[in-house]
Structure formats: C-alpha cells, structure tokens
Amino acid sequence: MRHHRTVLPLAGYTIQQIDFDPATFQPEDLFWLPYHASLTGWGRKRQAEHLAGRIAAAYALREVGEKRLPAIGDQRQPLWPTPWFGSISHCGQRALAVIADRPVGVDIERRFTPQLAAELESSIISPAEKTALLRSGLPFPLALTLTFSAKESGFKACHPDVQAGVGFNDFTLAAIKEGNLRLRLSTVEYRLQWIQAGEYIITLCAP
C-alpha cells in the first residue's frame, strides 16, 4: 500500500504519521503481520486502516530500537511488546502511532463542522462542560472536537487495569485553551497537548 511518513513532535514525544492511499491496498500487504490470518474477514477499508496504523507503530517502535511488532488482543487492541506502551489512531487516510515507557494516548479527528457539532454535542459533553467550552475563546466546533479527541486519548492513556472499569463519559473536561487542556477522571487529573494540522486535530495524553 502506498504511503508517506511524517514525524510530528508533540509534548516531548515523537508521533509517527502515515498518510496512505487505500486504493493501492492489496490483501497480501497484510502478510508481514504475524496475525494476518485473523484479519481475512475484515472489510477492505478496515484492513487498509489497520495496516496503516501498524506501519506507524512499526516506525514508532523502531525509534526506540524495538524490532517486534504489536500483537492483537481479543478486542482488536494493540498488545505492545514489553516494556513499551503505545497508542494508535487513524482518521480518513491518516494514521498515527506513538511509543513510550509509560501509558500514553494519541488521537486524531477531523474537525467537526458546526452542523456535526450541534448533532454530537449532547453525547460528548455535559452542560457544565459546554459552559467551559463557550468561555474558552475557541470556536465551539473546534473546542468540541478537542474535547472528544482528548477523552479518547485519555482513555487510551489509562493503564489496562483502569480501562476495564471506565468509559468515555467518565472523563470530565477541567480546562481548555490554546495548545493544551486538562481532563479529570475521578480524583486524577490528566494534562494533554494538542495541535491542529489542517482539517485534523491531534491530542496527546501522557499521565
């Protein structure tokens, strides 16, 4: 599958970005993944997205001298080689991966349109969180996209034992401004960094 790699520095981490052309994907492209046989029942689009994410992950692992690839869990989640933690995200024809020696979460989303923001608002934020977004000085569709993305990154950055007992709506927005934001999960606070890359929003959480 044809793809292009870009390296994005964010919050002291190196994010590997893969822009890929799904039209060039062929099923045999998956053969370099040890578990490729388990992907045969997936649709072509999902296979291409998965491959792009694992290519990004391979580059991320290579940066720390790790030659092993992530395995795949029973929920299709990446299982990172010990002692590493990592995160993968994809949106459209772009995939990201980041690796660290502690839990880390990355997410990429296409910026919501005003119409989509109005449709999704009630499923992403509470009335109190909406007040915080409106006071942030950021355009509401951007702020809502950031909040959604941040909660995704926050969940990914939780230790697997914690993930089993929490959901998206357990995270609460504590503060948001240009370049960074804060979430709360019970009594724990998560600090995140974010950037805007064209039509995309990228958030990174490293508790």
Question: What name fits each language-model region?
Answer:
Residues 1-207:
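Core catalytic alpha/beta fold that binds nucleotide/phospho-ligands
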